[in-house]
Amino acid sequence: MRHYEIVFMVHPDQSEQVPGMIERYTGVITAANGTVHRLEDWGRRQLAYPIQDLHKAHYVLLNVEASAESIEELETAFRFNDAVLRNMVMRTKAAVTEASPMAKARDERDSRRSPSDDRNVEESAEENAE
């Protein structure tokens, strides 16, 4: 089995369908004795250019170890799913398990926000108490 990195973009109106899609696609891989090494749901992000008059899409990243047949099955599923705007499957040399730069940036942004959010909540609680 080989290692692959898969990124697919989902129509923003179908964002609530993404967890089911992820479950279905990871099921295809695991049913063929494959392994999902990394799964990241990046959420809605701005597109670099409009696709089908859309300016945002829901991004998902998968790093998997799978057979060529299961990857072909995934690509076919992507092709026939109208909600999937774009997909990319790349073969990699080894399993990638650490967080992607996108996930790291989001975590850093969240960690920077949370202390200030806590302070704002405390300040508003103090103001309400007075």
UniProtKB/Swiss-Prot annotation:
Residues 104-122 have a biased composition (Basic and acidic residues). The keyword Cell cycle does not apply. Residues 96-130 are annotated as: Disordered. GO terms for cellular component: cytosolic small ribosomal subunit. InterPro entries: Ribosomal_bS6 (IPR000529), Ribosomal_bS6_sf (IPR035980), Ribosomal_S6_plastid/chlpt (IPR020814), Transl_elong_EF1B/ribsomal_bS6 (IPR014717). Coiled coil: none annotated. It comes from the Bacteria. GO terms for biological process: translation. Keywords: Ribonucleoprotein, Ribosomal protein, RNA-binding, rRNA-binding. The keyword rRNA-binding applies. GO terms for molecular function: small ribosomal subunit rRNA binding; structural constituent of ribosome. Belongs to the bacterial ribosomal protein bS6 family. Binds together with bS18 to 16S ribosomal RNA. HAMAP family: Ribosomal_bS6. This is Small ribosomal subunit protein bS6.
